[in-house]
């Protein structure tokens, strides 16, 4: 147990940020006689273990962290209460206070992942022989901190998720001005008039590479790197969390909750915070 907890346990710094967001439990037993409730810290350690390793919930019984039923039940309770979304919001606000969100250059992109159990917001993956898959759409700031998230089936075009991704930004966004434009860098998957009109509607300045344009730039400048590389890096960081690398959750709200927890960890790392 100590070896497992030593590697995957929630750090003290992160737990101190999470603890105020966890709701107090309500005792529904008429006599108050029931088994002792597993500590919130141990339940969070178990959830983080599942997120990092991608193991089945039932495998938690072998780790000694806590029982699989207790961890999964607590995960469902906190998902319904919006705890993981609040953690993501609180992490973004703290990041904004410490470093300031870089609104000048934003980047967006989508990434597809396998979803063997299917469920809502999944679809045939065109890059995986039409097997069941899911797509996550991210909007990040200039340093790679995730500001927006949307989930859909793998067969949905990236630009179709742009509105939902922008509208999911949980923090107050400053108003763009002529002196301080808010630029959004996107790849050729967003090369549609609908995407440009949508960005203009929200006050963003669009920078969308047309089909073939980036290939020509790379041919002339071998070391050329698009500004949106920070978004691709954030997707890569998310894939290190094996619990979201392959979507085993049939319910989309459970998958989104795991993504919010993973993004909380990513944003803390971008902010230079321990844990």
Can you name each region flagged by the protein language model?
Residues 1-275:
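Short alpha-helical elements
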């Amino acid at each position: 147990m100590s070896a497992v907890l030593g590697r995957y346990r929630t750090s003290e710094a992160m737990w101190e940020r999470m603890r105020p967001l966890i709701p107090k439990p309500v005792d529904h037993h008429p006599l108050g006689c029931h088994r002792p409730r597993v500590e919130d810290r141990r339940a969070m350690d178990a959830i983080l273990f599942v997120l990092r390793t991608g193991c089945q919930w039932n495998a938690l019984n072998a780790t000694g962290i806590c029982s699989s039923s207790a961890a999964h039940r607590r995960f469902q309770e906190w998902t319904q209460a919006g705890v993981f979304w609040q953690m993501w919001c609180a992490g973004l606000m703290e990041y904004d206070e410490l470093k300031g969100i870089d609104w000048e250059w934003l980047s967006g992109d989508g990434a597809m992942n396998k979803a063997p159990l299917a469920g809502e917001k999944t679809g045939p993956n065109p890059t995986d022989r039409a097997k069941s898959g899911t797509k996550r759409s991210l909007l990040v700031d200039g340093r790679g901190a995730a500001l927006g998230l949307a989930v859909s089936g793998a067969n949905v075009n990236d630009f179709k998720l742009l509105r939902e991704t922008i509208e999911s930004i949980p923090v107050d966004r400053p108003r763009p001005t002529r002196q301080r434009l808010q630029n959004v860098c996107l790849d050729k998957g967003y090369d549609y008039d609908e995407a440009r009109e949508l960005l203009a509607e929200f006050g963003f300045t669009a920078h969308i590479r047309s089909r073939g344009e980036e290939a020509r730039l790379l041919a002339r400048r071998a070391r050329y790197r698009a500004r949106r590389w920070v978004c691709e890096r954030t997707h890569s960081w998310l894939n290190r969390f094996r619990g979201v690398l392959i979507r085993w959750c049939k319910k989309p709200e459970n998958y989104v909750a795991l993504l919010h927890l993973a993004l909380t960890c990513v944003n803390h790392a971008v902010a230079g915070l321990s844990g």
